Regions:
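Short loop/edge segments at beta-strand edges and connector loops
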Residues: 33, 97, 128
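Generic structural signal for residues in well-ordered beta-strands
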Residues: 29-31, 95, 145
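Acyltransferase
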Residues: 180-214
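Histidine-centered divalent metal-coordination motifs
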Residues: 81, 130, 176
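Catalytic beta-strand/loop cores that center a nucleophilic Ser/Cys/Thr
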Residues: 115-167
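Flexible gly/pro-rich beta->alpha loop and the following alpha-helix that scaffold active-site loops
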Residues: 2-8, 13-79, 91, 197
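Cysteine-nucleophile active-site neighborhood
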Residues: 45-119, 123-125, 189-191
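Active-site-proximal beta-strand elements of phosphoester/diester hydrolases
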Residues: 126, 171-175
Protein backbone atom coordinates (compact mmCIF):
# COMPACT_ATOMS: atom_id res chain seq x y z
CA UNK A 1 0.00 0.00 0.00
CA UNK A 2 1.42 3.36 -1.03
CA UNK A 3 0.99 6.16 1.49
CA UNK A 4 0.87 9.91 0.94
CA UNK A 5 3.28 12.00 2.98
CA UNK A 6 3.28 15.76 3.45
CA UNK A 7 6.88 16.90 3.90
CA UNK A 8 7.19 20.32 5.54
CA UNK A 9 10.42 21.82 4.24
CA UNK A 10 12.05 24.02 6.86
CA UNK A 11 14.42 25.43 4.25
CA UNK A 12 16.88 22.57 4.62
CA UNK A 13 19.32 21.53 1.91
CA UNK A 14 18.73 17.82 2.46
CA UNK A 15 14.93 17.74 2.41
CA UNK A 16 14.78 16.26 -1.08
CA UNK A 17 17.15 13.49 -0.03
CA UNK A 18 14.69 12.56 2.72
CA UNK A 19 11.85 12.73 0.20
CA UNK A 20 13.93 10.58 -2.15
CA UNK A 21 14.33 7.90 0.51
CA UNK A 22 10.59 7.92 1.12
CA UNK A 23 9.94 7.64 -2.62
CA UNK A 24 12.39 4.72 -2.87
CA UNK A 25 10.31 3.03 -0.20
CA UNK A 26 7.13 3.55 -2.20
CA UNK A 27 5.65 6.66 -0.63
CA UNK A 28 4.11 9.54 -2.56
CA UNK A 29 5.61 12.77 -1.22
CA UNK A 30 4.41 16.35 -1.48
CA UNK A 31 7.17 18.74 -0.36
CA UNK A 32 6.00 22.20 0.67
CA UNK A 33 7.92 25.10 2.17
CA UNK A 34 7.18 25.95 5.80
CA UNK A 35 5.74 29.35 4.92
CA UNK A 36 3.60 27.95 2.10
CA UNK A 37 1.73 25.31 4.10
CA UNK A 38 -1.08 25.45 6.63
CA UNK A 39 -2.27 22.94 9.20
CA UNK A 40 -5.38 22.29 7.10
CA UNK A 41 -3.15 21.10 4.24
CA UNK A 42 -2.44 17.90 6.18
CA UNK A 43 -5.92 16.67 5.29
CA UNK A 44 -5.79 13.75 2.90
CA UNK A 45 -2.26 12.71 3.84
CA UNK A 46 -1.32 9.54 5.72
CA UNK A 47 1.57 11.20 7.56
CA UNK A 48 3.46 14.45 8.04
CA UNK A 49 7.26 14.76 8.15
CA UNK A 50 8.80 17.90 9.63
CA UNK A 51 12.22 18.35 8.07
CA UNK A 52 15.49 19.60 9.51
CA UNK A 53 16.22 23.29 9.18
CA UNK A 54 18.01 26.27 10.70
CA UNK A 55 16.94 28.12 13.82
CA UNK A 56 15.16 27.16 17.02
CA UNK A 57 11.77 25.48 17.53
CA UNK A 58 10.17 28.83 18.43
CA UNK A 59 11.18 30.08 14.98
CA UNK A 60 9.82 27.04 13.15
CA UNK A 61 6.71 28.66 11.69
CA UNK A 62 3.83 26.25 11.19
CA UNK A 63 5.65 23.28 12.76
CA UNK A 64 4.43 23.59 16.39
CA UNK A 65 0.82 23.93 15.25
CA UNK A 66 1.32 21.01 12.87
CA UNK A 67 2.50 18.83 15.77
CA UNK A 68 -0.60 19.81 17.75
CA UNK A 69 -2.83 19.07 14.78
CA UNK A 70 -1.25 15.65 14.23
CA UNK A 71 -1.80 14.88 17.91
CA UNK A 72 -5.46 15.88 17.77
CA UNK A 73 -6.06 14.01 14.52
CA UNK A 74 -3.90 11.02 15.53
CA UNK A 75 -2.04 11.55 12.27
CA UNK A 76 1.44 9.96 12.13
CA UNK A 77 4.20 12.57 12.41
CA UNK A 78 7.97 12.29 12.18
CA UNK A 79 10.17 15.21 13.17
CA UNK A 80 13.78 15.18 11.99
CA UNK A 81 16.38 17.36 13.73
CA UNK A 82 14.50 20.68 14.06
CA UNK A 83 11.22 18.77 13.77
CA UNK A 84 12.31 16.53 16.65
CA UNK A 85 13.09 19.58 18.78
CA UNK A 86 9.67 21.05 17.97
CA UNK A 87 8.00 17.84 19.16
CA UNK A 88 9.85 18.03 22.45
CA UNK A 89 9.12 21.71 23.00
CA UNK A 90 5.41 21.42 22.14
CA UNK A 91 5.05 18.88 24.95
CA UNK A 92 6.96 21.02 27.44
CA UNK A 93 10.57 19.89 27.15
CA UNK A 94 13.36 22.46 27.15
CA UNK A 95 15.49 22.86 24.05
CA UNK A 96 18.83 24.56 24.65
CA UNK A 97 22.36 24.76 23.31
CA UNK A 98 24.02 21.36 23.11
CA UNK A 99 27.30 20.79 24.90
CA UNK A 100 29.00 20.36 21.54
CA UNK A 101 28.31 21.75 18.07
CA UNK A 102 27.71 18.85 15.71
CA UNK A 103 28.02 19.40 11.97
CA UNK A 104 28.34 16.23 9.95
CA UNK A 105 29.77 14.33 12.90
CA UNK A 106 28.79 10.78 13.78
CA UNK A 107 27.86 9.32 17.16
CA UNK A 108 26.80 5.93 18.43
CA UNK A 109 23.16 5.83 19.47
CA UNK A 110 21.74 3.34 21.94
CA UNK A 111 18.00 2.79 21.89
CA UNK A 112 15.13 0.68 23.17
CA UNK A 113 14.10 -0.77 19.79
CA UNK A 114 10.68 0.84 19.86
CA UNK A 115 8.79 2.84 17.26
CA UNK A 116 10.84 4.00 14.29
CA UNK A 117 13.98 2.43 15.78
CA UNK A 118 12.65 -1.12 15.57
CA UNK A 119 15.09 -3.47 13.87
CA UNK A 120 18.09 -1.15 14.07
CA UNK A 121 21.24 -2.36 15.85
CA UNK A 122 21.99 -0.87 19.24
CA UNK A 123 24.22 1.01 19.14
CA UNK A 124 24.12 2.26 15.57
CA UNK A 125 26.02 5.08 13.87
CA UNK A 126 24.06 8.31 13.32
CA UNK A 127 25.06 11.54 11.63
CA UNK A 128 24.33 14.77 13.48
CA UNK A 129 23.94 18.39 12.34
CA UNK A 130 22.75 20.46 15.29
CA UNK A 131 23.72 23.00 17.93
CA UNK A 132 20.53 22.65 20.02
CA UNK A 133 19.22 19.60 21.87
CA UNK A 134 16.28 18.50 23.99
CA UNK A 135 17.20 18.48 27.69
CA UNK A 136 16.57 14.94 28.91
CA UNK A 137 15.59 15.93 32.44
CA UNK A 138 12.76 18.12 31.12
CA UNK A 139 11.09 15.54 28.88
CA UNK A 140 7.51 15.10 30.18
CA UNK A 141 5.72 11.87 30.92
CA UNK A 142 3.79 12.03 27.64
CA UNK A 143 7.03 11.39 25.76
CA UNK A 144 9.51 8.53 25.89
CA UNK A 145 13.23 9.01 25.28
CA UNK A 146 13.79 6.04 22.99
CA UNK A 147 17.36 6.81 21.95
CA UNK A 148 20.44 8.60 23.31
CA UNK A 149 24.05 9.01 22.32
CA UNK A 150 26.39 6.50 23.86
CA UNK A 151 27.87 8.42 26.77
CA UNK A 152 31.63 8.79 26.96
CA UNK A 153 31.36 8.11 30.70
CA UNK A 154 29.13 5.15 31.63
CA UNK A 155 26.16 6.10 33.77
CA UNK A 156 26.10 9.74 32.70
CA UNK A 157 23.31 9.38 30.16
CA UNK A 158 23.69 10.94 26.75
CA UNK A 159 22.17 13.47 24.37
CA UNK A 160 18.54 12.77 23.47
CA UNK A 161 18.48 11.34 19.96
CA UNK A 162 14.93 9.99 19.66
CA UNK A 163 11.53 10.66 21.17
CA UNK A 164 8.12 9.08 20.77
CA UNK A 165 4.73 9.79 22.27
CA UNK A 166 3.48 7.12 24.64
CA UNK A 167 0.05 6.84 23.01
CA UNK A 168 0.01 8.87 19.79
CA UNK A 169 1.87 8.18 16.49
CA UNK A 170 4.30 11.05 17.02
CA UNK A 171 8.03 10.41 16.63
CA UNK A 172 11.20 12.48 16.48
CA UNK A 173 14.88 11.85 15.75
CA UNK A 174 17.65 14.38 16.33
CA UNK A 175 20.02 12.82 13.80
CA UNK A 176 19.72 12.70 10.00
CA UNK A 177 18.46 9.33 8.71
CA UNK A 178 19.12 10.40 5.11
CA UNK A 179 22.88 10.80 5.63
CA UNK A 180 25.07 8.21 3.91
CA UNK A 181 26.92 7.80 7.22
CA UNK A 182 23.78 6.98 9.22
CA UNK A 183 23.24 3.29 9.71
CA UNK A 184 19.75 2.00 8.95
CA UNK A 185 18.27 5.22 7.58
CA UNK A 186 15.99 3.44 5.11
CA UNK A 187 14.77 1.06 7.81
CA UNK A 188 13.97 3.93 10.17
CA UNK A 189 11.91 5.75 7.55
CA UNK A 190 10.29 2.47 6.51
CA UNK A 191 9.26 1.86 10.12
CA UNK A 192 7.57 5.25 10.09
CA UNK A 193 5.82 4.48 6.80
CA UNK A 194 4.49 1.34 8.49
CA UNK A 195 3.02 3.60 11.18
CA UNK A 196 1.43 5.59 8.33
CA UNK A 197 -0.21 2.43 6.99
CA UNK A 198 2.33 0.76 4.69
CA UNK A 199 3.04 -2.46 6.57
CA UNK A 200 5.34 -3.78 3.83
CA UNK A 201 7.78 -0.87 3.89
CA UNK A 202 10.22 -2.34 6.46
CA UNK A 203 10.71 -5.49 4.38
CA UNK A 204 11.24 -3.45 1.21
CA UNK A 205 13.94 -1.41 2.95
CA UNK A 206 16.32 -4.36 3.10
CA UNK A 207 19.37 -3.80 0.92
CA UNK A 208 18.48 -0.27 -0.17
CA UNK A 209 21.51 1.93 -0.80
CA UNK A 210 21.82 5.55 0.37
CA UNK A 211 21.11 8.28 -2.16
CA UNK A 212 24.29 10.22 -2.93
CA UNK A 213 23.76 13.80 -4.03
CA UNK A 214 25.91 14.93 -6.96
Amino acid sequence: MSVRVLVVDNYDSFVYTIAGYLAQLGAECDVRRNDAVEVADAAGFDGVLLSPGPGAPKEAGVCPDMVRHCAEARLPMLGVCLGHQVLGEVYGATVTHASELMHGKTSLVRHDGSGVLEGLPSPFTATRYHSLAVVAETVPGDLVISGRTEAATPGTGGVVMALRHRELPLHGVQFHPESVLTEGGHRLLANWLAVCGDAGAPERSHGMAPLVRR
